[in-house]
A protein has these predicted regions:
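N-terminal FAD cofactor-binding segment of flavoenzymes
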Residues: 41-84
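Beta1/beta-strand and adjacent pyrophosphate-binding region of the FAD-binding site
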Residues: 1-14
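Predominantly flavin-linked oxidoreductase catalytic cores and closely associated redox partners
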Residues: 120-261
Length: 410
């Protein structure tokens, strides 16, 4: 049996970020993943500005290597399509200036991002990175946990569980239950040759009337590829008996804004489905000697479905909490509360604003009315750009009086 200070379960973005941050402070760890890398990961492959921000904070050299090796596409904004086919182009940063502003966002296949992060960990951790190694169960030990894996037992003083949305091993700590209203179901596939992609690689979100509060997406990728998908809240999928792949095909065949662009496009492989555990502040994500990070902690943005940035942030914060635990020699419940508090401080506000936006999308007629009024309004793109950089502005957009004022002031 090998012994370590921290056992990290999962080598996705959450787990690898935790490992790299622990390594900076020389805290011993073992990181295990059931997969071998590179491997496919079902995802939209769109990364928000949070991703370069937190990787740079970990190490500017790692961010440079990521850009060099993975050659992600820089994406500069979002094209929103509202019910009624109203189109709004919203740059992430208004009047973007590459000298002054950080990279606004990326698109890159998750297969590449995840393999890159694993390679970075492998370079510093060597055999402490155990791939093709499945965690089967965890039990409480005398001074921490005993983790039973397909490659033998590991004894660890702490656990960072970053095992994603679909892990199924038995653990002696509570894991959040996936409630249908707090879960989205999504499918994605790849196409080659989709026409009319935005020259500045804007990602496209189609909030169509029949799929609200979900959306259909077209995300441009390097090498002439595009990631195409659809995601809808699970309770809505179940209630309306929606077949996501069929609805996605129907949009590609018949939506007047979409179908002409797919006429000569080729689908590469079958659509693949997965669930997204949407952010839920009620969950307990830490306790004596353990922390949950990323999807295991249900940290996906309820409006946009963004989870990679939040997984990286939570992995980073979990590692810093673990460093505090070893420095103070405190692993008790009360001390671990700080982890949840810091996650709420960093991600809580945007999660709750996104939850409220998502609730608003339940009313298609209202959304259509707002879109009609907003069409051609010169204040809207700037206002929506500020949503990405200023949380207080995003909050203002939930205030009906503020929205009415902007809509009337054409
Ligand atoms: C269809 C779809 C589209 C999405 N689109 C986007 C997007 O465009 N942008 C975005 O930011 N987010 C998107 N997301 C969300 C994003 O994919 C997740 O939030 C992100 O992967 C979370 O990272 P993580 O490290 O927490 O978990 P994961 O990336 O899931 O990593 C968990 C790891 O744990 C391992 N593991 C699980 N069980 C065990 C076990 N028993 N033993 C050992 N290892 C185990 C797995 O093999 C995996 O490698 C999308 C999700 C879906 C489903």
């Amino acid at each position: 049996m090998q012994s370590t200070s921290v056992c990290i379960i999962g080598a996705g973005p959450g787990g690898t970020m935790a490992a790299l941050r622990l390594a900076k402070d020389n805290i011993p760890f073992v990181i295990v993943d059931k997969d071998e890398f590179p491997r496919e990961k079902i995802c939209g492959d769109a990364l928000s500005g949070k991703v370069p921000h937190i990787i740079r904070r970990l190490s500017p050299e790692i961010l440079e290597r990521f850009e060099e090796k993975c050659k992600p596409m820089h994406s500069f904004g979002i094209r929103f399509i509202a019910p009624g086919n109203y189109v709004f182009d919203v740059p992430f940063i208004e009047n973007y200036n590459a000298e002054k502003h950080p990279v606004p966002g990326y698109t890159v296949k998750r297969k590449l991002l995840d393999a890159f992060m694993v390679e970075e960990v492998s370079n510093i951790a060597g055999e402490k990175l155990m791939t093709a190694c499945t965690v089967m169960s965890i039990e409480k030990g005398e001074d921490g946990f005993i983790i039973d894996t397909s490659s033998g037992q590991i004894q660890a003083k702490m656990i960072i569980d970053a095992s994603g949305a679909a892990s199924s091993f038995k653990a002696p700590y509570p894991k959040p239950e996936p409630e249908p209203k707090k879960t989205a179901l999504a499918v994605r596939t790849y196409y080659k040759g989709v026409k009319g992609l935005h020259p500045e690689n804007f990602i496209e979100l189609y909030f169509l009337e029949n799929i609200l509060p979900g959306y259909f997406w077209i995300f441009p990728l390097p090498d002439g590829l595009a990631n195409i998908g659809i995601g809808i809240r699970k309770d809505v999928v179940l209630k309306k008996k929606i077949n996501l792949s069929a609805v996605m095909d129907e949009i590609i065949r018949n939506n007047p804004l979409v179908s002409p662009r797919f006429r000569d496009a080729e689908r590469l492989g079958k659509p693949a489905a997965c669930r997204l555990p949407l952010g839920n502040p009620r969950f307990r994500i830490a306790g004596e000697r353990y922390m949950l990070a990323g999807d295991a902690a249900h940290l996906v943005d309820p409006l946009t479905g963004e989870g990679v940035g939040n997984a990286l942030y939570s992995g980073f914060i979990a590692a810093e909490q673990a460093i505090d635990c070893f420095n103070e020699n405190r692993f008790d419940d009360a001390f671990m509360l700080a982890y949840g508090q810091r996650i709420r401080r960093v991600l809580g506000k945007e999660m709750s604003i996104s939850t409220n936006f998502q609730k608003m999308l339940k009313y298609p007629r209202m959304v259509k009315w707002i879109a009609k009024r907003a069409d051609g309004n010169k204040h809207i793109p700037g206002l929506m750009s500020s949503m990405f950089t200023d949380l207080d502005h995003r909050k203002k957009l939930l205030n009906p009086i503020f929205i009415l004022r902007v809509l009337m002031n054409r």
